[in-house]
């Protein structure tokens, strides 16, 4: 069976387009906020396409509509091009010390400024991140810059159990965001993504005026695949999967519709908006399934994904015997946990049992099942998460 578009192995927008790979077009949603200035923050679990979103924004602001004419935003976007400072904070999250972290942050920022074609004649690479950024921004008069930060939370999450290092990194990052705020007049647009919301912390109070799109029902499908998108962009892969699965099982059990239902139970039913308007599938799991399903069942990578996240470390520090039993009961019986919307993104300066369900939500282990008068009911989204989370909780 031939496919009009290949499945992408990269999160880079330009590579996806140039290689004629499947790109799920959400640019109409991008148009709804990218014409504004921000700053915006957007939180979603790992694997939901945040890096592709950042890459799409980078290409849009740097190149205009050059690579977007055939996409939905092609008829909506009228803006000019800009210099883009694009940072990925996950690139220096594993620093061995505060000084190493600061030096790695400097290198990442210096490279990003250079890639944005900004003049670096008067700056030194060994300046602190805040000083380095300030020296560049003070010489810019108009709103000619776009700032994009991917995985902003990665350096803090990596040391969440080490209070001393967490506090040191938090201070460095807080100074950086204070600089961004001080020079907000030079930015045309600021957009920041991550998994865990640390901006609720008093340490980041200098940047707490950013608009959070995470719970906004208008952007519930900004990350993740809806069922309509699965049908639209992956229909040939669904049909091929049916043929392979029927061959493997020596039956005609799988049809287009019931495979969709199976995928929803295993990889879908995530909801992150406060009106329960949009339900989405995990993109990385869907692409993995279709990529690996050839002549045998794909190996599951869900458990590995959980182990590679901060969840393992977090649970080891907060799970008492009673809370562990309570959580396992919720997993086994499918019991929902009610949480005030205001508590979904609490102040996270340290690990506590009080933050357990909020962290589980932010990392994608729980999602919104119902919403009423500011109270959100949280539950396990699907079978894969249920199995992986149960195994993880039992092991810690």
Task: Go through each PLM region and give its residues.
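Amphipathic alpha-helical segments of the small helical/lid subdomains adjacent to P-loop NTPase cores
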Residues: 202-206, 213-291
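Structural recognition of the conserved hydrophobic beta-strand(s) that form the central parallel beta-sheet
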Residues: 146-150, 171, 175, 188-195
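Extended alpha-helical interface modules used as scaffolds for assembling large macromolecular complexes
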Residues: 281-396
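Conserved P-loop NTPase "ATPase switch" module shared by AAA+ and STAND
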Residues: 141-167
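Substrate-engagement module of ASCE P-loop NTPases
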Residues: 135-138, 167-188
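P-loop NTPase motor core
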Residues: 9, 66-114
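Walker A/P-loop-proximal flanking segment of P-loop NTPase domains
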Residues: 1-48, 52-61, 65-71
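Short glycine-rich substrate-engagement loop in P-loop NTPases that contacts/grips substrate
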Residues: 99-100, 118-136
